[in-house]
Amino acid sequence: MLGSKFRRWATGGGVLLLLLVALAVSLLLARGRGDDGTLDRVQATGELRVGLDASFPPFESLDAAGNVVGFDADLARALAARLHAEPAFVNIGFDGLYDALLANRVDVVISGLPYDPRRTQDVIYSHPYFNAGQVLVLRAGDSTMTGSGSSIPMPDLLAGRTVAVEWGSQADMEARRLKQTIADLETLPQPTAQEALGALVAGDADAAIADAVSVYQFMSANNGQVRLVETLTDEPYVIATRIKSRRLAQAVDDALTGLRDSGTLDALLAKWF
């Protein structure tokens, strides 16, 4: 089940296909600009400098002993191991991560980092490893509604239903978009995503829309009460390297492929969500 949830990063179709094409073009362009030797240094020293903002659990945070822990931290360790290195974490405020990368203070940024097309002149992005987009959630065992994979299309699934959302969030915007095409769809705004999911469990709403991170956190804390049935939007998390660290960028993508194929990424998702 967790494996299938992780693979939902690929269900968005068009958006992620365009992203993968853009990433491939970016890497091809970078190949004509030479390599800065970062991969050689990483392998020679056995150290991969990883920039992150350790204030975003469960992706990255500090434990009581000051150690960096979380999904991204474990991903960095697994990725570094495939490069025959150990990660050296550099804790930086999120707004300073790109500057640190471009100033050669870190080799990669692994920090719940969304793909940003405006940055592709300066950095190479990896393939996505997590989709933090908006998802549709139902109560577990709700026999009145049928989830993804059924023959019931989305308009019929939600017609005449109430959907809980965090007011003013991307989920709220997505619900407003759905209301334009789904008859009698009502929204139930809540102060936070967690409260929107709580309203679903309490029976105040028939469904909820929230970002995937909030949903996975809620599912972890409330085992068996809700189920994710549809990915509605894509917000891929990616790893960034400098534009001239093209060999390192390729090694990162190769490592991610290996971690995905080996089931390591699924195992990390199960551990942290």
PLM features per residue range, with description:
Residues 36, 89-99, 149-152, 187-198, ...:
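Short helix-initiation/N-cap motifs at beta->coil->alpha
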Residues 48-49, 84-86, 102-111, 161, ...:
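Alpha-to-beta junction loops
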Residues 139-163:
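Flexible hinge/capping segments at coil-to-helix
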Residues 131-138, 212, 216-257, 273:
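Periplasmic-binding protein-like
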Residues 23-36, 168-188, 226-228, 257-273:
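Ligand-binding clefts/hinges and TM-proximal coupling segments of bilobed small-molecule sensing domains
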Residues 95-99, 113-122, 176-178, 199-233:
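A ligand-binding cleft/hinge motif common to bilobed small-molecule-binding domains
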Residues 11, 32-112, 121:
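Extracytoplasmic small-molecule ligand-binding "clamshell" domains
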